[in-house]
Amino acid sequence: MFAFSKAPAGCSTYERVTQKFQDGSNKLRAAIEMDELTKQNGTINEKLQTAELYKQARQMLKEANEFNIMDIPESKRSEVREKREKTLNLEKSAQDRLIKICNEVDPNMKRASTAADPCRAARITPRNTRATVPGDKKVSKVKQTEKAPHVCSRGDRCGAHQPPPEKKSTPLKPVNQIRTRVKENKNPIGVQQQVFSFILSCCMRRNCRRPHYLFPCMISLKMNYFKFQATLPNQLNTVNRSNLLKGVDKAIGERLLDEILDSTGVRMDDVAGCHSAKATLEEAVILPALNPNLFSGLRQPVKGILLFGPPGNGKTLLAKAVAGESKQMFFNISASSLTSKWVGDSEKTIRGLFQIARNGQPSIIFIDEIDSILCERSEKDAEVSRRMKTEFLVQFDGATSSPDDRILVIGATNRPYELDDAVLRRFPKRIMLNLPDTEARKELITNTLKKHDMMDGLSSSDIRYIASNTSGFSNSDLVALCKEAAMVPVREIHRSKLSVTDGDKIRKIRASDFDTALRTIRPSTSDRILSKLSDFSRNFGC
């Protein structure tokens, strides 16, 4: 009915996106046509084929959105953005219809003929009478005519016709005796996904020779699988893109949506030390999500957290951990995200940022190096800079903001004493991430070496010795020290043998390698910076 072609390998990103969008639309149109034909009196097999078409259409439309907008020619970006918005709506419609079809099919339906003779229900479907799915290029080899006898692939479960008695096939094992290659898993959803994948591969492939009595089991698993997918607590999947951009200029909104971090792969356990900052972030982000009604009124979590301290002590890494563990919308904002060469665009961008955060709340806005944007106001400031700071303060906590807004702003800076007083007032939690102590240094060195499988040549006493000799080192200094120590065994290899040496044959790192590395890697934080940060923490810190 419809032809689904593949884009050429050497085509541009724009052509590939357009082709995938067209293929997904055609597949969805085929699914809708088959859905209309089978909505009233369709059989279970036909409805499952319709659901499979919807699933393929969703996958094609999802692939059409996997591109970088900067790879598209500037003259075509507006067209591609419109197609992306349309694609998201079509994908959502296909998902809703897919779940509805699974809900319509009763997995516990009793069939008298199957119960009376289970072997007859295990009849193999003849290849030349296989049902043709709309959009499939393969056509049945034998045309159905009025004189030809009707052969139904559903066997005795077909209410309109009976299978011819001369057609016989060897009965297969009942479904409860078939050995499925499913690994043991304590998670029931994981087991259902594996069983569903096995049955789907047996029943829905083109050269299917499996009996159709597997379909009732597949229906039950498919319903649970799609219901589980629909209830995943991912904030980005549950909020429609058009709802996020409500009340926001489209061009500015699309640029801000590119600043959203989906997943960073960093967890709280990856950050050594910083216990007070971890506890504060857990209290402000994770606990209110568990019981929002409890954290209301006077228990309402703070809306601003300022992380300050010497450079290289995990401020940005801690924000990445929050983005990785929380299911909230996370904006990673820098100075380049808010500034513009056009007059008035910076204020519009800030207003659009907070509007998108309100539309998708609960949400988190992380501003790295916040002192470059919100430093202390003075008479020497340019007019654009003053307007941008004023707009940020108004949107953060002004007349347009609401006390019920669940928006958390996290700022990170190495120079907190340069921030404006009004900015400090909007960050009630001001936490200093100081240089790691001995225990934190031991933990960081151990984690870094274990991550790269280089702990074999070192004992716990060696780690304790290294940590005691690295006083004043920041987290980034310790990582650089580990890298330098790992290079010491490599430097011992002669240059002529370096190209043919296997990495497994290099000797293990020893404590003496860290002594060698300490001669070149020195602390990067001066006493003057530490003194100024300590004074600020004593006067304004929490």
From Swiss-Prot:
UniProt entry keywords in alphabetical sequence: ATP-binding, Coiled coil, Cytoplasm, Cytoskeleton, Isomerase, Microtubule, Nucleotide-binding
GO molecular-function terms, A-Z: ATP binding; ATP hydrolysis activity; microtubule severing ATPase activity
Enzyme Commission (EC) number: 5.6.1.1
Gene Ontology cellular-component terms listed: cytoplasm; microtubule; microtubule cytoskeleton; perinuclear region of cytoplasm
Primary enzyme class: isomerase
Chain positions covered by the region annotation Disordered: 131-177
Record Pfam families: AAA, AAA_lid_3
Subcellular location: Cytoplasm, Cytoskeleton; Cytoplasm, Perinuclear region
Superkingdom: Eukaryota
Residue ranges, compositional bias (Basic and acidic residues): 135-169
Coiled-coil positions: 29-66
Primary localization class, coarse: cytoplasm
Entry-linked SMART domains: AAA
Catalytic activity: n ATP + n H2O + a microtubule = n ADP + n phosphate + (n+1) alpha/beta tubulin heterodimers
Self-association state and partner proteins as the record states: Homohexamer. The homohexamer is stabilized by ATP-binding. The homohexamer may adopt a ring conformation through which microtubules pass prior to being severed. Interacts with microtubules.
Function according to Swiss-Prot or TrEMBL: Severs microtubules, probably in an ATP-dependent fashion.
Family membership noted in the UniProt record: Belongs to the AAA ATPase family. Spastin subfamily.
Name of this protein: Probable spastin homolog spas-1
Protein species of origin: Caenorhabditis briggsae
Higher taxonomy: Eukaryota, Metazoa, Ecdysozoa, Nematoda, Chromadorea
